[in-house]
């Protein structure tokens, strides 16, 4: 369970980084460095999301499939983190 908590926390960090990078890019869309930074941040966010999703599927031995895990992360993440933090 600790691994899942770490993956969800990593996802939250990657989302924060991507949000800041997106704000910089939107403020100065002609800035190539901001564009590249946002692209990389978004890729890292997506990778963290997929890792958490696949880990839920793995740890439940497929009883929670990829799509159900995706929905859990999108709609019940706070509850998951709360339960796993105990």
Annotate each language-model stretch with its function.
Residues 10, 14, 28, 44, ...:
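Positively charged, low-complexity intrinsically disordered regions
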Residues 20-71:
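Acidic, low-complexity, intrinsically disordered interaction modules
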Residues 1-15:
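Short, charge/polar-rich alpha-helical segments
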Residues 62-86:
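Amphipathic alpha-helical binding modules
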């Amino acid at each position: 369970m600790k691994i899942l908590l770490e993956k969800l926390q990593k996802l939250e960090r990657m989302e924060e980084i991507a949000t800041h990078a997106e704000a910089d890019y939107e403020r100065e869309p002609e800035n190539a460095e901001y564009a590249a930074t946002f692209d990389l941040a978004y890729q890292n966010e997506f990778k963290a999301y997929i890792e958490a999703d696949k880990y839920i599927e793995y740890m439940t031995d497929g009883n929670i499939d990829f799509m159900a895990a995706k929905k859990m992360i999108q709609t019940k993440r706070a509850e998951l983190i709360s339960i796993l933090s105990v």
